């Protein structure tokens, strides 16, 4: 950024830790900082923009998750499955323990300014055909406390979805004619994200259009580290998808005193934390590394 170069971030973990600072720095330097196309956050953002552009109110935006949740998963416990999939066991562990979904939906939340419904989100089990019955407000039989939320569902992976509504009679009539349902809630679903195949689109967007695909516009959500096992003084925290921690998405307003997942790799444990509990900052001695220094700048 300081050299006047556009930055297309393939590491979403970095975005949910210091992305707001990077976006601000890029704006000052007249360059683009963006999460790269290809993964669910940008795919969701594109579907969100599409939904709004054609006149809908977005009730819920999110992604499908296909791996059963196991917040105790480690590279060791998943080694054989990872080898079968030709994957890095640590990466697979970050999917199975839920960290990756929490990270991706936090990036989306901060990028579009739409909050999470609650700590950890709802994550109902749902077929695509039932998304517009599940991810809607409780008052209409769904799981959301309120409309306008970021969430996810077990089942409709690897796609992304936008649950929308409208009071426009012309759109309602046309949606019925197009066999999209009688409303009041409709599901717009994109059944894929194409990873590195899509990533080059980010280059064109940055260089030709001078636009980001997704960047933080606010900081309303945070991924907090939780203990994957009992942590004791003297332990050292390893990285995302490791043996000691996993991530849970929080409304930022509920994170006082808690340690963001992206800051704790290499931290020394100085206070006990029970398995499954959020990790307090006071229980860690954070490393004096670049990511923590940049986060301090973001906080200030």
Please provide the spans of the model-predicted regions.
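Short, ordered loop/turn segments at secondary-structure junctions
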Residues: 11-15, 38-39, 63-66, 242, ...
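General beta-strand structural signal in soluble alpha/beta enzymes
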Residues: 9-10, 33-37, 58-62, 118-120, ...
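Aromatic/hydrophobic pocket-lining residues that form π-stacking "cages" and hydrophobic walls in ligand
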Residues: 22, 47, 105
């Amino acid at each position: 950024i300081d050299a006047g170069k556009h930055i297309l971030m393939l590491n979403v973990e970095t975005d949910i830790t210091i992305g707001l600072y990077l976006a601000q720095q890029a704006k000052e330097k007249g360059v683009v900082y963006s999460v790269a196309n290809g993964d669910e956050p940008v795919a969701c953002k594109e579907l969100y923009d599409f939904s709004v552009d054609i006149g809908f109110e977005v009730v819920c935006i999110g992604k499908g998750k296909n791996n059963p949740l196991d917040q105790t998963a480690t590279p060791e416990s998943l080694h054989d499955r990872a080898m079968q999939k030709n994957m890095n066991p640590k990466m697979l562990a970050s999917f199975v323990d839920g960290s990756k979904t929490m990270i991706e939906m936090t990036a989306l939340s901060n990028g579009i300014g739409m909050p999470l419904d609650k700590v950890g989100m709802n994550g109902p089990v749902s077929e695509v055909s039932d998304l517009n019955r599940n991810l809607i407000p409780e008052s209409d039989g769904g799981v959301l406390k309120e409309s306008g939320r970021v969430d996810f569902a077990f089942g409709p992976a690897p796609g992304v979805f936008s649950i929308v509504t409208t009071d426009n009679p012309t759109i309602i009539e046309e949606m019925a004619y197009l066999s999209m349902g009688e409303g009041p809630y409709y599901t717009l679903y994109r059944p894929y994200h194409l990873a590195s195949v899509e990533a080059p689109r980010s280059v064109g967007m940055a260089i030709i259009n001078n636009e980001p695909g997704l960047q933080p516009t606010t900081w309303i959500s945070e991924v907090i580290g939780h203990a994957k096992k009992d942590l004791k003084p003297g332990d050292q925290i390893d990285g995302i998808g490791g043996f000691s921690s996993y991530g849970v998405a929080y409304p930022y307003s509920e994170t006082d005193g808690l340690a963001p997942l992206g800051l704790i790799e290499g931290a020394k444990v100085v206070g006990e934390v029970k398995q499954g509990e959020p990790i307090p900052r006071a229980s860690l001695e954070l490393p004096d590394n670049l990511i923590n220094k940049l986060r301090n700048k973001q906080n200030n």
